[in-house]
Amino acid sequence: DCATVADMAKKAAALEGVDFVCLRLDSADPNGQNAPVEECVETAKAVCEAIDKPLVIAGCKSIEKDAALVEKIAEALQGKNVLYLSAREENYKGVAAAVGLAYGQKVGAESAVDINLAKQLNVLISQIGLDTKNVVMNVGSAAAGYGLEYVISTMERVCSAALTQNDTMLQMPIITPVGAETWSVKESVATEEDMPQWG
């Protein structure tokens, strides 16, 4: 009953307890389908128009392609309530400038499960002129096991420094996009034949 991505997003937005909808542009991956930027922009516009919740847009994890994607999508969705994942150390200038400075939208600052890297990236983004009120931290994510525990430990350290030490460079909200990580865990992709005891 969902013919398009926008239909899926509308259905997801209507679910009880949903605060926002995340659109992952995996089809843009140059090592996969390599969907053109223009097609991804049209998809993002359709999803944004279909939902009444804030929209989070995640790229395809290709630094070059994501830079092109976020700039064009931010331009097309100017004035909308959108958070873009993610600005990383390798591309923060382009992403933060295109999304935050040029179009006044929100930027996710992605670091690799390390409080010092998270703070450093926040400082760098603020130094290019982006208001920290438009930054959301993505301190890393994991779906299970030690990785998840390490992510939670990092988040606790960030919150502790932000609150007890009044560290303004760690006082941004945190988002942890775990959903995509779940598909890299063997329990999610194992067939019933491989692991019959899991059902």
What kind of region is each of these model predictions?
Residues 1, 19-23, 53-59, 80-87, ...:
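Hydrophobic faces of well-ordered beta-strands that scaffold small-molecule active sites
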Residues 1-7, 11, 32-35, 59-63, ...:
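Active-site mouth loops of central-metabolism enzymes
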Residues 12, 73, 137:
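Conserved, mostly hydrophobic/aromatic
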Residues 17-46, 51, 57-63:
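Glycine-rich, proline-tolerant flexible connector loops at the mouths of alpha/beta enzymes
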Residues 90-199:
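Catalytic alpha/beta core domains of metabolic enzymes, predominantly
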